[in-house]
Amino acid sequence: MSMTGSSAYYVAHAIPPFLRLSNKTMLLLSTPPTTFFPTSTTPRVTLLSSTSSSSSSSISLRSSTAPSPSCSSVTPKDNCLASAKHSPPNMSASVSSRTFLNAQSEQDVFAGIKKEVEAGSLPANVAAGMEEVYNNYKKAVIQSGDPKANEIVLSNMIALLDRVFLDVTDPFVFQPHHKAKREPFDYYVFGQNYIRPLVDFKNAYVGNMPLFIEMEEKLKQGHNIILMSNHQTEADPAIISLLLETRLPYIAENLTYVAGDRVITDPLSKPFSIGRNLICVYSKKHMLDDPALVEMKRTANIRALKEMAMLLRNGSQLVWIAPSGGRDRPDAQTREWVPAPFDISSVDNMRRLVEHSGPPGHVYPLAILCHDIMPPPLKVEKEIGEKRIICFHGAGISVAPAISFSETTATCENPEKAKEVFSKALYNSVTEQYNVLKSAIQGKKGFEASTPVVTLSQPWK
C-alpha cells in the first residue's frame, strides 16, 4: 500500500549531460517542499499510547505484544486501474461520500459495499478487494492483542474504504512531483494511523539514531541527503516514518518517494500514496509491458527527473532511493530474505545528479526490515492488483555513516570500476545493517544484536 522501487528510461539529448541516465535508471523516492522548518500549523504525528487519542480519521492506535505474527492475504480479482483522463489534477481527495463514514458496525460497512455495487458506482473487483482487505486487516490487528482491536479496525477501515470509494468515483491524478495532501483530509496521518497497529513496537528498532539526527542538522544547513536503501514492502514509507516520528517528526513527514505507476493507479494503494511526497515515474520492471506505451513512459520519466533536479537545486532535500529496482524477495532455495543487489548505473546516475545540483550532498546507506508486515508476491507481476498479505510484526531501520565517492574510489583505475566499487560499498553497508536488524527482530536478540557498527535503540520510548 505504499511505494515501489525503480524506473528505466532513455533520456533525450535535450536533457543536460548530468541528467542523461542509462536505460537501467531506478525509481527515485524523493524529497520535500523547499522550506525546511515546518510552520506552527503543520500537523504532527506522534506515536500514540494505549490511552491517547489520534487526530484525523482514526481512533487511538497503538501496538501491543502478540503471541505470533498473524497473516492474511487479499487478492484484487482484476486490474484495478482507475481512468483519470477526464479529471483535473489534484481535485479529488477533498470531499467524501457518506456511504462508509456513516457506518456504525462491520455489518454496515459490508452493506455499504454491496449497496454501491448494486448502484453501479463501485466495480465488483474493487468491492471484492475492499472486503478482503477488511477481513485480513482485522485478523492482523486482532492478533496484536490490543483490547480495542475491533474498534481500531472499524475506524481505520471506514477511513480507507471511504477514500478508495471517493477515488473510484473521482480519480485523483498525480503530477510528476506530488506533494503530500495534508488538508482538508490529512492523508499522511491517515496512512500512519492505518499501518501503526500492524507494527510490534516492542520488537522494533532503529539503528544509529545519532546519524538520523546528524542528517537533520545537515538539512538545516541546506545540504541534500540521499538514502540508498533496500526496499521490502508497499508499507516501507509508513514504517520509516513510524519509527522516526517521535524523535524526528520533520524527517518522518518530509521524506519524498519516487513512486512507480502501480501505487498511483491501484485503488487500494492510491490513498496511501496521496499522503506522501512523490516523484512519479514508471518502473523499469514494467517499462516494456505494453510496447505502445514505452515512449510515453520514457517521456514522463524525463519530466520526473527534471523535477528531481529542480528540487535538489533548492537544497535541504531528503531523498530515499531503492537502487535495486524493486522490492526484496526471498531466496528461491533458502527462503531467506536479503537485500536485492543494487543496480550500478542507478547508483551512479543518482550520485551524478546530486553532485551537479549545487548544494552539498551526502549519500547514506539505509537498511529496512519489515517484509513480514506486508510481504510482496514471490515474483514480479504484470497485472495491477497483487495478492497482499497483512501481518502484525516487528520492523526496523538503520543508517550508516555517509559514504564518499571520491574517498571510496580513490585507487580505482577507471570510471567503470569506480562506479562498481561505490555501489558495492553502499550495498555491503546496507546488508551488514540488515543482518543486525534481522538478528534483533527475527532472531529475538533485541538490543543484544547491536554491534560496533550498528547501535540499536527505540526512540519512541
From Swiss-Prot:
MF terms in GO: glycerol-3-phosphate O-acyltransferase activity
Alphabetical list of SUPFAM superfamilies matching this protein: Glycerol-3-phosphate (1)-acyltransferase
Known pathway: Phospholipid metabolism; CDP-diacylglycerol biosynthesis; CDP-diacylglycerol from sn-glycerol 3-phosphate: step 1/3
InterPro entries, A to Z: G3P_O-acylTrfase_chlp, G3P_O-acylTrfase_N, GPAT_N_sf, Plipid/glycerol_acylTrfase
Pfam families in the cross-refs: Acyltransferase, GPAT_N
Low complexity: bias regions: 47-76
Protein keywords: Acyltransferase, Chloroplast, Lipid biosynthesis, Lipid metabolism, Phospholipid biosynthesis, Phospholipid metabolism, Plastid, Transferase, Transit peptide
Reaction catalysis annotation: sn-glycerol 3-phosphate + an acyl-CoA = a 1-acyl-sn-glycero-3-phosphate + CoA
Keyword Chloroplast: yes
Record motif HXXXXD motif, residues: 231-236
Family that this chain belongs to: Belongs to the GPAT/DAPAT family.
Function: Esterifies acyl-group from acyl-ACP to the sn-1 position of glycerol-3-phosphate. The enzyme from chilling-resistant plants discriminates against non-fluid palmitic acid and selects oleic acid whereas the enzyme from sensitive plants accepts both fatty acids.
Protein name (record): Glycerol-3-phosphate acyltransferase, chloroplastic
Organism: Phaseolus vulgaris
